[in-house]
A protein has these predicted regions:
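Solvent-exposed loop/turn segments at secondary-structure junctions
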Residues: 51-55, 77-81, 103-106, 117-118, ...
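Ligand-binding grooves and catalytic loops that recognize ribose/phosphate and carbohydrate rings
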Residues: 81-112
Length: 156
């Protein structure tokens, strides 16, 4: 009986794959993984990012868009007033950008890729966040979590 319980437990644990990156120590690995996931996207990427000024990821998104991936990036209105270089770059390259005009701050750091992968955490997409900050990035294919994130973000 104990064997059955242990096997069942191990199956449930391995049902979803996930990775955690602790920055700044694992910044290079996290950057590489995010770029890889963007490049491997098949159909769609949805991003809600409070602070997005890292050109490396913008260029990855532009390349994915050129290969037919539909991309939407949600920005916070107050933050884009201060720095809109990435917003303009993405728009110029045909990527759909949405600026949250709600009175509430859009402080999310969420990426959904093909409704199969979620990237969440405390990390903004800025060079400083990857080089100087203590931050966390969590990547998962947990279907329940992805569905919950999609539902939540569709209401913003």
């Amino acid at each position: 009986m104990l064997k059955i319980i242990l096997i069942s437990f191990l199956f449930v644990i391995n049902l979803y794959s996930s990775e955690v990156y602790l920055l700044p120590k694992q910044s290079d690995d996290a950057e590489s993984k995010i770029s890889e996931l963007i490049q491997e996207a098949d159909s769609e990427i949805f991003i809600a990012m409070y602070n997005f000024s890292y050109k490396k990821f913008a260029n990855d998104l532009i390349e994915a868009s050129k290969h037919g991936v539909r991309i939407t990036v949600l920005f916070d209105q107050k933050k884009t007033k201060k720095d809109d270089e990435i917003l303009d770059l993405l728009r110029e390259n045909g990527i759909k950008t949405v600026v949250n005009k709600d009175k509430n701050k859009m402080h999310l750091k969420v990426v959904l890729i093909d409704s199969k992968t979620a990237i969440i955490g405390s990390t903004n997409w800025t060079k400083e966040s990857f080089e100087e900050n203590y931050d966390l990035i969590y990547i998962t294919d947990d279907k329940k979590l992805i569905l919950k994130l999609k539902e939540f973000m569709s209401k913003i």
